[in-house]
Amino acid sequence: MLNKKKMHVSIVLTTCFFALPLFTRAANPPDAAPVILIQNATILTVSHGTIEHGSILIKDGKIAEVGASIKAPKDAQVVDAAGQFVIPGIIDCHSHIAVDGSVNEGSVSVSSIVNIADVLNPDDIDIYRDLAGGVTVANVLHGSANSIGGQTVVIKLRWGLPASRLPFEGAVPGIKFALGENPKRSNFSIPGATPRYPATRMGVEETIRTAFAEARDYKKTWDDFDKRVAAGDKSAISPRRDLRLDPLVEVLEGKRYVHAHCYREDEILMLLRVAKEFGFKVRTLQHVLEGYKVADEIAAAGTGASTFSDWWAYKVEAYDAIPYNAAIMTRRGVVVSINSDDAEEATHLNQEAAKTMKFGGLSHDEALKLVTLNPAIQLGIDKRVGSIDVGKDADLVIYNHDPLSAYAVVQQTLIDGRIYFDRRRDIADRANLEKEKKALMEKEKKAEEKKGEGKPGDKKRGEGKPEGKPEDKPKPPQAASVSGGAL
């Protein structure tokens, strides 16, 4: 049995360890958007070049001024960024952070009824860690277990605020599709259970087509009802709601974006054909590792591509992946972003983007767009974020080196003009936490020593025990004796 006091101290220490970011939550409360002037920085605006020794004035959470010389207002908090670089906040177009529990509702092939926004977890430590990597916005997706998965949500990484404050206000909602090995469950089965349809790529296509045929008919039923009501027909009876089809109708109406997990060229072209058949647009192809083979078709469809920088050969679908994928699609006119699909990968998306300069020869500006403006365009939020322009949200990252350098380390991350990560404060809090841990350990040590000394007259451990061998001790009448000498 565990010593209760030791267990208590262990819990305290463990809690302190995992609570470290609690000390480094937003420096400014949500209702106190400060006036901040960042000055003497190299500003990489993404949209209109680089400003050397530049300044950014932030008011009410927005970028108020950007230029070479801005006078600080009297009430401004001045950040001297001499020798440092400022870029727009990094946007991860494929993320699974901040989710409470599994990201997959894999019991059915079409799970459009479920919504990731309902299970956001504001205490997920990956929010803080990704802030430390410069990420300010994430497209949080359902998993890829279904041909048509759950509804998605775009969030801002407002660490320290409740779940209701995470969603990006005004962002177009999305829905996750998946093609290939994952939805047909090539490497997954439940013992004793009937395999779930579909089990082939053909089945995946027909699952999507059938769902949209139903959604189209469902939409027509509602359109007819609305026309009758508008014409004054009081006998019109409202159709029955279908929560599974409602999100698909929103796709048909352009009110919800499709983000499709895919790898191979054949399935990419298949989905583009189905989308054309039903009159909707695929907003982004996610992963899209063979996108370079059909880049012209992707560009012609007006579809974006969100891919990895250099992940390949980790499963059969990724066999033909190449690190030149992002650059080739960019050259062919596709709006491309680099995503993480992994909480740790998201902490260095700036360096993932930099790899495209080596593999494909993208320029510095083109590479930086892959994790800033381009994903903003893909998510339909480029009027608010993605570049450093007057009027946009003050979502900014300050680096100690060029952000595409392997030596770049985030110094501060701002969202809506508030500092949500500060490296100096983080380091100071680590030192304070270490002191607290040592103090608790010392307190426990003294308590144990005091307990060992005992009170005057107390018997020490082992005192007062019966003498003699076990076999000499009294035993109940008629009890059998068993010698354990040979055991």
Task: Map each language-model feature to its residues.
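Polyanionic/metal-chelating signatures
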Residues: 131-286, 409, 415, 426, ...
